């Protein structure tokens, strides 16, 4: 196979991996955690994954501490945690 063909194949495989939905078994365990505002007192609008609704939702983060179920964008939350 030519190098151009290999690059095309690699690109297609990468695209497929990016677009493949995450099943519940492949979801990172931190997606199962409840949102934590943390110990600081800022009032930052953030996104967390809600396991019960299988949706990303808004919560307010204090700015420090908390856990990894804390995203700055909807896309980041969906890509990481939402199973279809």
From Swiss-Prot:
Transmembrane segments: none annotated. One of its GO terms (biological process) is venom-mediated suppression of fibrinolysis in another organism. One of its GO terms (molecular function) is serine-type endopeptidase inhibitor activity. One of its GO terms (cellular component) is extracellular region. Disulfide bonds join 31-81, 40-64, 56-77. The record marks 41-42 as: Reactive bond for trypsin. InterPro entries: Kunitz_BPTI (IPR002223), Kunitz_BPTI_sf (IPR036880), Prtase_inh_Kunz-CS (IPR020901), TFPI/VKTCI-like (IPR050098). Gene3D superfamilies: Pancreatic trypsin inhibitor Kunitz domain. It comes from the Eukaryota. Residues 1-24 form the signal peptide. It is found in: Secreted. Expressed by the venom gland. Pfam families: Kunitz_BPTI (PF00014). Residues 31-81 form the BPTI/Kunitz inhibitor domain. Negative results: does not inhibit activated protein C (APC), in absence or presence of heparin. This is due to the absence of heparin-binding motifs. Consequently, heparin is unable to enhance the inhibition of activated protein C (APC) by this protein, as it does for DrKIn-I. Does not inhibit tissue plasminogen activator (tPA/PLAT) and urokinase-type plasminogen activator (uPA/PLAU). Does not prolong the prothrombin time. Belongs to the venom Kunitz-type family. Serine protease inhibitor that inhibits plasmin (90%) (Ki=0.19 nM), trypsin (70%), FXIa/F11 (37%) (Ki=6 nM) and FXa/F10 (20%), and prolonges the activated partial thromboplastin time. This antifibrinolytic property has been confirmed by a fibrin plate assay. Shows less antifibrinolytic activity that aprotinin. In vivo, reduces the bleeding time in a murine bleeding model, and prevents the increase of fibrin(ogen) degradation products in coagulation-stimulated mice. This is Kunitz-type serine protease inhibitor DrKIn-II.
């Amino acid at each position: 196979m030519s190098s151009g063909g290999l690059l095309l194949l690699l690109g297609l495989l990468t695209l497929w991996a990016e677009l493949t939905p995450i099943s519940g078994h492949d979801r990172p365990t931190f997606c199962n955690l409840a949102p934590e505002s943390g110990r600081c007192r800022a009032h930052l609008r953030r996104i967390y994954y809600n396991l019960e609704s299988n949706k990303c939702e808004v919560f307010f983060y204090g700015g420090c501490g908390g856990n990894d179920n804390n995203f700055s964008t909807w896309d980041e939350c969906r890509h990481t945690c939402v199973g279809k």
